[in-house]
Amino acid sequence: LPTNFVRDVIMKASGKDIMNSMTRSVLTLGSYDDTLNDTSLSNVLRQCLMLISEFPMLAVYGYRAYSHYERNKSLYIHRPDMSLSTAENILRMLRPDKKFTKLEALVLDIALVLHMEHGGGNNSTFTTRVVTSSGSDTYSVMAAALCSLKGPKHGGANIKVQQMMKDLKKHVKDTSD
């Protein structure tokens, strides 16, 4: 990420919604790209690969800001370790002690793959195709796709799963039954 990006963009404009934080961050990253409006295949590929490499940091740092400012948790920022996988880095950056097990990393890695490969006809893919067809820049396209993930009929379903799990934990005393 650009110098001071985490401090100036993510931490100073934290919010209650991680998807909004990530969308804002993606749009802001476009202002750092001198080739923002170059829609050649080679440039778009470069931009997409760069964004793919930055998404884990945007998610983790957005969550850390939310956790600190909205939930009054301690603030700590861990930089990624280039010798680790994406899943390992996410777990390492999320935890105060940076510790995780190989099993946790494997489970997260599989979950990430499943989320990426769940089908080609979903809302975010459709949104990406529509906005791309207008000739828009990569950052605007990705921000639009992120916005489509937020709705309760798409990515918002994950929020409903979290709410259901909290409700089950609260109301089911013996989970082994």
Task: Describe the function of each predicted region.
Residues 1-177:
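Hydrophobic alpha-helical bundle cores within soluble ligand-binding/oligomerization subdomains
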